[in-house]
């Protein structure tokens, strides 16, 4: 059995796995902030405050219009991704992250497959996301699923002064892209 076959995913209903979710969200924001500071000299988030806000608003990542998908490898939660509603036809992927020690085992692909299945189940016609420009491996993964680059969209949560450091992508779910 190869590593990819050992990666499993599960959808989460809160409060299940809330501590793992908070830890991965925090780790993602710290890692992303450090890279943004190193590469661009900017620091877009206070990770602790951002996680606290996401936890307060966690219902947006829950059914019927959203979902959180965890990836698990050999019994350890190693990554996650979140889906939320922009409008009745468009969902947004947020906070997709795989712990660096678990990368290259298929966890990101498994999370994305799970999120897109959830988006189709909700009935979204499109899914959007934003991603820091330095996350080239993630962009390759998104493109392999059919995502295309788009302009910044008005519903993005990132302050506009940071949009130049981000890539915006969209997947049309009316086609079978995978």
Give, region by region, the residue ranges found by the protein language model:
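Structural signature of beta-strand start/N-cap positions in the alpha/beta core
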Residues: 67, 125-126
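Active-site acidic-Proline motif in GNAT/NAT acetyltransferases
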Residues: 99-105, 133-134
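Conserved G/P- and acidic residue-centered "switch" motifs that form tight phosphate/ATP-binding loops
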Residues: 106, 123
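Loop/helix-junction capping segments adjacent to catalytic residues or to phosphate/diphosphate-binding pockets
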Residues: 15-19, 105, 136
């Amino acid at each position: 059995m190869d590593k990819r076959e050992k990666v499993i995913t599960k959808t989460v209903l809160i409060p299940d796995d809330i501590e793992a979710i908070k830890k991965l969200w925090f780790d993602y924001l710290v890692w992303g902030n450090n890279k943004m500071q190193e590469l661009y000299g900017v620091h877009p988030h206070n990770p602790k405050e951002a996680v606290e806000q996401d936890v307060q608003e966690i219902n947006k990542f829950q059914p019927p219009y959203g979902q959180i998908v965890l990836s698990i490898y050999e019994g350890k939660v190693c990554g996650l991704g979140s889906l939320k509603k922009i409008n009745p036809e468009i969902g947004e992927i947020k906070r997709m992250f795989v712990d660096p020690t678990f990368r290259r085992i298929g966890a990101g692909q498994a999370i994305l497959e799970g999120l897109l299945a959830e988006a189709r189940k909700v009935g979204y016609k499109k899914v959007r996301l934003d991603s820091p420009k330095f996350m080239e491996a993630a962009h390759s993964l998104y493109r392999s699923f059919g995502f295309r680059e788009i302009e910044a969209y008005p519903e993005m949560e990132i302050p506009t002064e940071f949009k130049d450091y981000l890539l915006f992508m969209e997947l049309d779910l009316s086609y079978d892209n995978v």
